[in-house]
């Protein structure tokens, strides 16, 4: 039986297990046979047949919640993904391999957590409690890093051969604990809430705002603490205390700010089966566009993760830019403003028209950063790279949300994290560490050595960006075929 609309005034019928009824605006319901899911392409066709416009009115509270929770969540992720790298590099002289291991362990923790909590939030039909409760615990876990200091470690582990090695291990372990709470709140619940609260008419614009937050968070964190001496343990105590406290307070604010969406939980009762729902061959076969887009997104993020864990160290140590924030900050602001408007290109022109220029900017930025070291040219290269990075995040993010099956947003956040975090978080930093294996080293004051990141990380990232096209070309053909069938 083919999908059809049940019009207002008709009694909502009951169908055999596996078949679905999905609510549409103006009291309409969409019936789908067993095994089919209401992806964006199906919904768009059905809406056009009855003259409906897919338009979600997002109020001021929605956008306020979007900006606050997205920004503060990304501030916390910046502390983990970039500041922890600087933290263990400065305090414990961690190697590139240790940094790579930390990023990989965090990626695994994020993926497992998102699969578990995403499916759980779908089962009980609640997002708000996971967002707010998660942010509260997230803040406490960040605060705990204020106590990971050499003097504390030496007092607690007097028999340890190397307090620095213990410090690196503790940071990696606590990073995974922090990731559990952060992924529960942000990756699983908050991102599912965004999918529930938007549709294909405004996802590009919303993703434009959401995608610019990671770099705005970098600006907030590194700009806010620019005057601090990162070689002093007291500095990190202050940083972790402030960030942890802010995240905790936002968790409290969320109880008053976030509107709980009404979710359909019928069909989501089998929790443990739903954890792996998105990995079933039948589900993959029913949503091919979603999974091909996710694969392209994974390769895109591998390219980013090759250089991103070492980017600040490259500016600071390799290029000798002590005030790198003064160069990095304007590039972030301009790239964020660019992305806020660029997301609308996806809404009005579609995926193909939006993703190709974004990738072109990203690759051009890599080329400039690889060949040049002067401050002015590095700024231009950084701006191009950041514009391409943020625009790409917005476009891929909107595309994946559009093709997420309705009523399964929580379950499918795990798949999104596989493409955005797990695969890139393991492969990307490992490639970066391999590229930097024979990098120059410097001798620290205590006799230990530290590596110096070099421009080869951008060359490796460029190669990965070229590889995106191997997936992107088939994806664009699939979209063109869908469009011709819908016409």
PLM region descriptions:
Residues 54-60, 262-294, 487:
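Juxtamembrane intracellular "pre-TM" segments in multi-pass secondary transporters
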Residues 55-107, 289-319, 325:
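Helix-loop boundary and gating motifs at the non-cytosolic
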Residues 71, 141, 155-185, 377-391:
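Hydrophobic core of transmembrane alpha-helices in multi-pass small-molecule transporters
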Residues 111, 204-226, 417-429:
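Glycine-rich segments within core transmembrane alpha-helices of 12-TM secondary carriers
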Residues 113-126, 338-350, 436:
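Helix-to-loop junctions at the C-terminal end of transmembrane segments
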Residues 127, 229-245, 436-466:
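A membrane-interface helix-boundary motif in multi-pass transporters
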Residues 129-144, 353-368:
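Structural signature of the two symmetry-related core transmembrane helices
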Residues 146-150, 248-258, 456-487:
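Multi-pass alpha-helical transporter architecture, strongest
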């Amino acid at each position: 039986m083919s999908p059809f609309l049940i019009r207002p005034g008709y009694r909502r019928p009951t169908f055999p297990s596996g078949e679905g009824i999905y609510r549409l605006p103006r009291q309409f319901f969409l019936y789908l046979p067993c095994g089919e899911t209401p992806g964006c392409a199906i919904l768009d066709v059905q809406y056009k047949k009855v003259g409906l416009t897919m338009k979600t009115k997002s109020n001021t509270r929605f956008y306020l919640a979007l900006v606050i929770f997205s920004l503060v969540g990304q501030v916390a992720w910046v502390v983990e993904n970039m500041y922890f790298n600087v933290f263990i590099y400065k305090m414990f002289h961690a190697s590139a391999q240790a940094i790579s291991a930390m990023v990989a362990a965090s990626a695994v923790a994020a993926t497992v957590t998102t699969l578990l909590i995403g499916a759980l939030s779908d089962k009980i039909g609640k997002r708000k409690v996971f967002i707010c409760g998660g942010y509260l615990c997230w803040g406490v876990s960040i605060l705990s890093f204020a106590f990971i200091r050499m003097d504390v470690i030496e007092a607690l582990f007097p028999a340890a051969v190397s307090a620095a090695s213990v410090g690196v291990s503790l940071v990696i372990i606590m990073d995974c604990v922090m990731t559990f709470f952060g992924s529960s709140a942000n990756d699983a619940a908050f991102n599912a809430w965004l999918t529930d609260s938007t549709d294909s008419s405004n996802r590009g614009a919303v993703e434009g705002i959401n995608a610019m937050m990671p770099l705005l968070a970098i600006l907030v964190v590194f700009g806010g603490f620019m005057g601090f001496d990162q070689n002093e343990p007291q500095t990190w105590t202050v940083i972790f205390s402030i960030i942890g406290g802010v995240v905790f307070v936002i968790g409290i604010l969320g109880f008053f700010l976030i509107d709980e969406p009404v979710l359909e939980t019928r069909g989501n009762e089998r929790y443990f089966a739903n954890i792996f729902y998105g990995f079933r061959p039948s589900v993959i076969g029913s949503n091919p566009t979603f999974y091909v887009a996710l694969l392209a997104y994974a390769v895109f993020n591998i390219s980013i993760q090759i250089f991103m864990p070492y980017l600040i160290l490259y500016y600071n140590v390799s290029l000798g830019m002590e005030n790198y924030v003064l160069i990095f900050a304007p590039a972030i602001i301009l790239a964020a403003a660019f992305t806020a408007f660029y997301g609308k290109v996806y809404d009005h022109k579609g995926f193909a028209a939006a993703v190709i220029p974004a990738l072109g900017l990203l690759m051009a930025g890599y080329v400039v950063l690889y060949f040049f070291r002067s401050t002015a040219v590095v700024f231009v290269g950084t701006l191009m790279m950041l514009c391409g990075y943020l625009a790409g995040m917005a476009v891929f993010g909107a595309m994946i949300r559009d093709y997420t099956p309705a009523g399964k947003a929580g379950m499918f956040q795990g798949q999104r994290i596989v493409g955005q975090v797990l695969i890139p978080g393991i492969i990307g930093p490992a490639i970066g560490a391999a590229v930097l294996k024979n990098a120059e080293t410097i001798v620290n004051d205590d006799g230990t050595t530290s590596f110096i990141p070099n421009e080869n990380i951008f060359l490796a990232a460029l190669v990965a960006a070229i590889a995106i096209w191997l997936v992107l070309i088939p994806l664009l053909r699939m979209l063109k075929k869908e469009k011709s069938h819908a016409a």
